[in-house]
């Protein structure tokens, strides 16, 4: 259940933020929130997170569907007490679903978080995916260590 709740919350927050950006900005508009550090900048991204692989929507739609299918499968395999793994998969699934929605209905992904310290603009869904993948890597490393100790 935690996976579904997390997916729903991530998707809803992502959707609300994107609708607010689309309704209040024109593409390319940038508003400084913290000058020279953080701006809200509305861009339509034809690629992956952080503008990588532009124009490859045909790769990302099936990839997101496969990720979501894998998470549905995992829902039934992960013990209930492994709540952190369930939360992690919910973050990844919610982010994947948020960007999949954009690709299917807009043709590009709405990005708006613009930290001036690097040239990438991203969104809440991207952040959820990155945090989820980071947590997944940590959990996998911890599990590997645990298995090595029992051998």
UniProtKB/Swiss-Prot annotation:
Catalytic-site annotation from UniProt: 111, 126
Associated pathway: Protein modification; lipoprotein biosynthesis (signal peptide cleavage)
Family matches, as Pfam families: Peptidase_A8
Entry superkingdom: Bacteria
A molecular-function term among this protein's GO annotations: aspartic-type endopeptidase activity
Predominant location: membrane
Record keywords: Aspartyl protease, Cell membrane, Hydrolase, Membrane, Protease, Transmembrane, Transmembrane helix
Top EC class of this enzyme: hydrolase
Subcellular location: Cell membrane
HAMAP family, A to Z: LspA
Family: Belongs to the peptidase A8 family.
Protein name: Lipoprotein signal peptidase
Lineage: Bacteria, Bacillati, Bacillota, Clostridia, Eubacteriales
